[in-house]
C-alpha cells in the first residue's frame, strides 16, 4: 500500500486497454488521452497498436472512420455511454468498415444504471449483470452491419493522471468546483415545490441537479476502484459543503459493499472544498518552478495541465514564424528516461532556486555521460548558461535520443526563466506581501484603494502593468484572505470606484481573451458595450463577496490570515496546512470541522452511542494511508507541503494528494466567474 499505488493503479488500467488495441484504430477523448499522457505516454499505445500514428484519433463527431483495411477499432472514453457519446459512436462506426469494436468506458456499469434512472433496489438485483453494456454491444454489431461481428463494452477506471508518486489529478473532472451561495439560489428556483435551502450548509445530494449528482457519482466510482486496487476499506471525511456530498456518496456507494467487507487495509479519505481557501490557489508564494512553467508557457492543445515547450532550437529549422508548427512541441510529462524522471521529481519537490540548480546538474551529468565538450561554470545559474549546455546535444542524434525527456525539461526551464511573465510573478508576490501587511494596518477599503491606480485601460498599459485577467486574480486574493468583510460606507464607495474602473477597462479592450469572452458573454470586443461590462463586473463582485464569506460555515478553520505583531510580520496560513495539523493533532480530540461520513447503520449506531458511552468515533489519523482529495484543484506547492507535513507529524503514514486539477492562478477566475458549476457537460 505505498504511495506508488497511484501510478501502479493508472498503469494497470492502461495495460488492460493496451491488451485490446493490436492492429486497431484507436479513438480517445481528451480526458482519457490526458490520463494516458501522464500514465505511460502515447508511444506505449503506439507500440501496442503496432501501426502508424494515424491509427490514433480524437473521439469527435467529425473523426475519420476506418478504411477497408482497418477492420478493428477501440474507443477509449471517460464519459457515460449515453446521448451524444452514443450518437458519435454510431456516426463513426456507420461510415467505417469495422468488424471488431471494443468500447472502453472509465465509468462503471453501476453508474450507467444510475444514468439510465434505474432505481437503487432494482440496480442491487442486477449485481454481476451488465445489461446496459450488453445492449450497447448489440447496437455496435447492428451499426457494423453484421450481428456476427465482434463487439465488447467494458469498464476500466481510467480517471487518474499521475503527476508523481504522491500526486494525481482527474482530467474528466477538471470543471468540478465547490458551490457558492448564488448556486443555492439557483437550486431553490429550480425546485419551488420543495423545502427552501437557506445556506450551502443545507445542500445534500437530493438538492443537486441530476447532471452534477451524476458527475459526482462518476468520480466516486473511480475513487472506489482506486480503493479496491489499494486493498483498503476507506473511512470518509469532509471539510466543506460539496466535499460532504462527495464523501457521503463514497461512504455509501452500494457496489463497494462487498469490497469493504473483504479489504484487509484501511485508509482515511479526506475531501476539502477549494473555495474555503482561494488565497493559496491564486497566490504566487509557492516558490515552485513547475507552477511557474505551467503558468507562463502555452497550454498543450487538448490538455488541461501540460504545456508546449518549443524545441526548435535543437533542430536545424530556422526560427521563423512559418516554421512554428513544423517541429512538435516538447512537454512536461515524464518520459521513460531515469534521469528525466529523477529531475521531474526534484522539480516538484524543490524550491525555485534549488530546482534550477538541479536542472543544471542533470544537464552537466548527461553531457558528461555522452562525452560532450562541456565547460563547467559555478555560481548563479542563468538561462544562457543552461542553454549553452542544451546546445551541446544539438547535432548529436544519439545523445538527443538518450536524453530527450531531460532536454524538454531543460528547455521548459530556460523558456520560463526568460519569459516576461516570470518577472510579473515577482511583482504579484510583492503586492501580495504588501497586502498581508496592509490588512493589519488598514481596512478592506484601504486595501482596495491601493488597487485602484493599477486598473489601466489597454491604451495606458505597459507590459509591466496588469491586464484585466490579472486584476481578477488580485481581487480574488484580496477577498479570500481576510474572510467575511462588513460592508460599511467606505468599503461600498471604494468598491463602486473599482467596479466602475474595471468596467471601463473591459469595455475599452481591443481584443477579448477566451476567459473574458466567457465572463462577459461577448465573442468580440466590438460587442462589449459599457452596460454589458457593468453587468459582468457586478456578477464578479457578487462572487467575490461570496468567496469572502466561504469560511462562515466553519467553526475551527475560520481564518487563513495570521496578524503581525512586534516580532512577526502578518502571514498567510494555508487551510490545507491547518487541516493536516488537525488530523495529526497529538491531543486527538474529535475534529470540529473535519466531519466523518457514516456508511450505514453500524456507523450511525457508533456515532449515536458515542454521545453517551465511551465509543470512539473514527478519526482521520487512525489509518496508515491518508488520501487527501481537494475538490476544485490543488497547486504543486500545496501538494509538496502536505507530503512534507505528514512526514514530519506522523512518520510512516503514507499520503496521496488527489484533486480535480492542478492549479495555476488563472484557472480560478474561470472556475469562479465562467463555469456552470450546477450543470457540468457530461457529453449527453
From Swiss-Prot:
InterPro entries: Sec1-like, Sec1-like_dom2, Sec1-like_sf. Keywords: Protein transport, Transport. It comes from the Eukaryota. It holds the Pfam family Sec1. One of its GO terms (biological process) is vesicle-mediated transport. May be involved in protein transport. Belongs to the STXBP/unc-18/SEC1 family. PANTHER family: VESICLE PROTEIN SORTING-ASSOCIATED (PTHR11679). This is Sec1 family domain-containing protein 2. It comes from Mus musculus (Mouse). The lineage of its organism: Eukaryota, Metazoa, Chordata, Craniata, Vertebrata.
Amino acid at each position: 500500500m505505498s504511495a506508488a499505488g497511484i501510478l501502479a493503479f493508472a498503469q494497470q488500467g492502461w495495460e488492460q486497454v493496451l491488451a485490446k488495441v493490436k492492429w486497431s484504430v484507436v479513438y480517445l477523448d481528451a480526458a482519457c488521452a490526458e490520463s494516458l499522457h501522464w500514465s505511460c505516454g502515447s508511444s506505449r499505445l503506439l507500440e501496442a497498436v503496432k501501426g502508424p500514428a494515424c491509427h490514433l484519433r480524437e473521439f469527435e463527431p467529425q473523426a475519420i472512420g476506418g478504411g477497408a483495411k482497418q477492420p478493428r477499432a477501440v474507443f477509449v472514453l471517460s464519459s457515460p455511454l449515453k446521448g451524444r457519446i452514443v450518437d458519435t459512436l454510431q456516426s463513426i462506426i456507420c461510415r467505417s468498415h469495422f468488424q471488431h469494436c471494443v468500447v472502453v468506458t472509465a465509468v462503471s456499469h453501476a453508474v450507467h444504471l444510475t444514468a439510465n434512472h434505474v432505481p437503487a433496489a432494482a440496480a442491487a438485483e442486477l449485481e454481476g449483470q451488465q445489461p446496459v453494456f450488453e445492449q450497447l454491444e448489440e447496437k455496435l454489431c447492428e451499426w457494423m452491419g453484421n450481428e456476427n461481428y465482434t463487439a465488447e463494452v467494458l469498464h476500466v477506471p481510467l480517471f487518474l493522471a499521475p503527476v508523481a508518486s504522491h500526486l494525481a489529478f482527474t482530467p474528466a473532472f477538471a470543471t468540478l468546483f465547490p458551490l457558492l451561495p448564488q448556486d443555492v439560489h439557483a437550486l431553490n428556483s429550480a425546485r419551488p415545490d420543495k423545502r427552501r435551502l437557506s445556506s450551502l450548509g443545507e445542500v445534500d445530494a437530493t438538492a443537486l441537479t441530476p447532471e452534477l449528482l451524476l458527475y459526482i457519482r462518476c468520480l466516486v466510482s473511480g475513487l472506489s476502484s482506486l480503493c479496491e486496487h489499494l486493498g483498503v476499506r476507506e473511512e470518509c471525511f469532509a471539510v466543506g459543503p460539496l466535499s460532504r456530498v462527495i464523501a457521503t456518496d463514497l461512504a455509501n456507494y452500494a457496489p463497494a459493499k462487498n469490497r469493504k467487507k473483504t479489504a484487509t487495509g484501511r485508509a482515511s479519505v479526506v475531501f476539502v472544498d477549494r473555495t474555503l481557501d482561494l488565497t493559496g490557489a491564486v497566490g504566487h508564494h509557492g516558490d515552485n518552478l513547475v507552477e511557474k512553467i505551467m503558468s507562463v508557457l502555452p497550454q498543450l492543445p487538448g490538455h488541461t495541465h501540460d504545456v508546449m515547450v518549443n524545441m526548435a532550437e535543437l533542430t536545424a529549422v530556422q526560427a521563423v514564424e512559418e516554421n512554428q508548427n513544423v517541429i512538435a512541441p516538447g512537454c512536461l510529462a515524464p518520459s521513460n528516461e531515469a534521469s528525466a524522471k529523477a529531475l521531474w521529481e526534484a522539480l516538484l519537490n524543490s524550491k525555485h532556486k534549488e530546482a534550477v540548480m538541479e536542472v543544471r546538474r542533470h544537464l552537466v551529468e548527461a553531457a558528461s555521460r555522452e562525452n560532450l565538450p562541456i565547460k563547467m561554470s559555478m555560481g548563479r545559474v542563468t538561462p544562457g548558461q543552461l542553454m549553452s549546455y542544451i546546445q551541446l546535444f544539438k547535432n548529436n542524434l544519439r545523445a538527443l535520443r538518450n536524453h530527450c525527456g531531460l532536454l524538454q525539461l531543460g528547455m521548459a526551464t530556460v523558456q520560463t526563466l526568460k519569459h516576461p511573465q516570470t518577472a510579473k510573478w515577482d511583482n504579484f508576490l510583492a503586492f501580495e506581501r504588501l497586502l498581508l501587511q496592509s490588512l493589519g494596518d488598514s481596512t478592506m477599503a484601504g486595501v482596495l484603494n491601493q488597487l485602484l491606480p493599477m486598473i489601466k485601460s489597454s491604451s495606458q498599459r505597459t507590459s509591466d502593468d496588469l491586464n484585466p485577467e490579472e486584476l481578477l486574480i488580485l481581487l480574488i486574493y484580496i477577498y479570500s484572505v481576510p474572510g467575511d468583510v462588513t460592508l460599511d460606507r467606505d468599503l461600498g464607495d471604494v468598491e463602486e470606484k473599482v467596479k466602475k474602473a474595471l468596467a471601463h477597462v473591459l469595455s475599452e479592450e481591443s481584443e477579448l481573451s477566451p476567459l473574458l469572452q466567457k465572463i462577459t458573454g461577448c465573442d468580440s470586443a466590438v460587442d462589449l458595450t459599457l452596460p454589458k461590462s457593468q453587468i459582468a463586473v457586478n456578477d464578479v463582485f457578487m462572487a467575490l463577496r461570496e468567496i469572502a464569506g466561504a469560511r462562515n460555515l466553519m467553526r475551527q478553520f475560520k481564518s487563513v490570515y495570521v496578524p503581525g505583531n512586534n516580532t512577526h510580520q502578518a502571514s498567510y496560513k494555508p487551510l490545507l496546512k491547518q487541516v493536516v495539523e488537525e488530523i495529526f493533532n497529538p491531543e486527538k480530540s474529535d475534529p470540529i470541522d473535519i466531519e466523518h461520513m457514516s456508511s450505514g447503520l453500524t456507523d450511525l449506531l457508533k456515532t449515536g452511542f458515542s454521545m453517551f458511552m465511551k465509543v470512539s468515533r473514527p478519526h482521520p489519523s487512525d489509518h496508515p494511508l491518508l488520501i487527501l482529495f481537494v475538490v476544485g484543484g490543488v497547486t504543486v506547492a500545496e501538494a509538496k507541503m502536505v507530503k512534507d507535513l505528514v512526514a514530519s507529524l506522523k512518520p510512516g503514514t503514507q499520503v496521496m494528494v488527489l484533486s480535480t486539477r492542478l492549479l495555476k492562478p488563472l484557472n480560478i477566475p474561470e472556475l469562479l466567474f465562467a463555469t456552470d458549476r450546477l450543470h457540468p457537460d457530461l457529453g449527453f
